[in-house]
Structure formats: structure tokens, C-alpha cells
Amino acid sequence: MKQLIHEEKTQTTCVLRLFGAPLWTVQQAAQQADIAARCRGRGAEVLAALQAETPAGLEKARKALNGRFAAELYGEGETTLVHAAVQALETHRRLLVCCDADAGTLLEARLETVPGAEKVFDFGALSYADAKTREKLSARTCRVKGGPIPAKLARVQAAQRFVGADLAAGCVERAEDTVLFLGSRRGCWVRTVANTDAPALWLLDMIRRAASGLPQAAGTSWQKYGRAVPADVLTVQTLPDKPENTAPAKPPRKRHRVRNALIFLLVLALAAVAAAWYYTGGDLTALPQRLQSLGADSLPHAGAKLI
């Protein structure tokens, strides 16, 4: 124990784990806070390796990123997302069930590796794997019209109520994507994820955030029971892309140069008019004759010698 405390007090490096934050936002936040960080992204997960000269500097960097990414930051070091989800359920005393075997397949293989997961997840014993509960769920959803999405939303609500769980998970697997559902007493979070984008991890992150009372990631929508799910929610949701550079374009600068040149020429013209007015005594019509007389005076007279 003393050794661990000593290591914490002298630690100058650490690795923070985030899920649901675009890589570019983490890099930008570290740069703005003057934090020495190497960031690496894989899918929706980002690992940020922090380094500081002193333990106090490292703690300051930790707090800065935690303040910026409170919902996305789920752990440090070797902590995995599934461990973070189980810890959130345990800490806040939330019970999780699945309304169907598809959602159970996404979660069970990962949760069974975490000690104590059976305290917060039923592994189907009280829900979809129980014959009586499964019969009740089927009876509830067979009357729902509109296709698999409204039926799944009703099944999630029924599973949460019949079992008395705090959270109920479900999913609709399609050819190229999976629609994830996580229901509570008041409503349901819905997110559509590409099958290549690890739907199981997204569902675990939704569970972690919901259990902890944290806001869901961008693209995850809140849906009330009994209402139609909007079509845009049923399309694949991705994290925000980095905005393009908003530096001034070159054409406006060219227009500024042309305007300045015109102003300069106008000033020269006004100066010429003023000089002509002074030279002719206000009679500008005599200007051509005056100019001719100047030209005649400059010509050599007859008999003059050129030196």
C-alpha cells in the first residue's frame, strides 16, 4: 500500500481512456491547455498518454481533460469500458437486463469476464431467458404495429417494468447497422451504429453513462415510449468531424487591393484638377492654350546655338 501511494505521488505519466469523443477534440483540448499528450484513436475510443514534469503538473492535466470530457472519460490505465460500465452500475446500484437474446449476445460474453457483474446484470435469468417473462414480453409486443422498431421499443419498456430493473437493453440487427435501445422508466435512448463500429462497445458506453447520470454521446437520441422513432435516428450516427479552416479567402483580399488602387488614382486626379485650377486662375478652358505656350517656349529660337 505504501508503495502504491508513493508511486501516485511521484507519477508523471498516465494514460486516460475516453469513449465517444472525436480524436481531434481531445488533441485540440490538450493543445489549448498546453498539455503534453500523445493521443491515439480507434473507432470511438481515444487513448491519451499524458506526461508532465512533476506529479502536480500531471494532476493539473488530468483535471483539465476531466473537466472538458467528464462524460467521455471512463477510466485510466488498464481500465476497460466493460469494467467501467459494471463499476457505474455497482456504484449507483442499478440493475440491468436485456429484453432479447440479440442484446444478450452483445453483452454477456463481455460482462461474464468481470467479477461481480452478476450483481448488476441478470444474464437473462430474469428476463429473456426466463420462459414466463419471455411469454409476457411476446404477448406485449405482438399487438404493436409499425414494424420491428416500434415493437422493440415496446419490448424494452415491458422488460424494464416486468422485471423491475432500472435499465433494459435491446437491439435490432440489420444488414449493415444495428439499432441500440437502452430503456429506463421514463423513456429510451436510441442509437444506430454501423456493424463495423463495435455496437457492443457503444451499448456498454450508453449503459455506463445512463447508470452514472451522464449525458449521452452526440448522435444518441432520447425517445419517449409510445411515440414513433424519427427516421433520422434510424440512420447511422457518427461522431462530429473536424470543422474546416475558416481563414479569410483570397478573393476578398484582392477586392481590397483593387479598391485601394482606385482610391489612389482618384486622389491623383483630384490633385491634377487642383493644380490646373491654380495654374489657369480658375479658367480651365484656357488650360490647352497655356500648355501649348509652354511647349513653344521650350523650343530653340532661330539662330540659337546648342551647347
Predicted regions and their residues:
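Short alpha-helical segments enriched in small residues
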Residues: 2-8, 19, 23-31, 56-240
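Ser/Thr/Pro/Gly-rich low-complexity linker/stalk segments immediately outside membranes or between
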Residues: 282-295
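Short beta-strand
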Residues: 37-42
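A generic structural motif
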Residues: 44-55
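Membrane-anchoring helices that localize proteins to membranes
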Residues: 254-281
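Short, solvent-exposed mixed-charge patches
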Residues: 304-307
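Intrinsically disordered, low-complexity cytosolic tails and juxtamembrane linkers
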Residues: 233-258
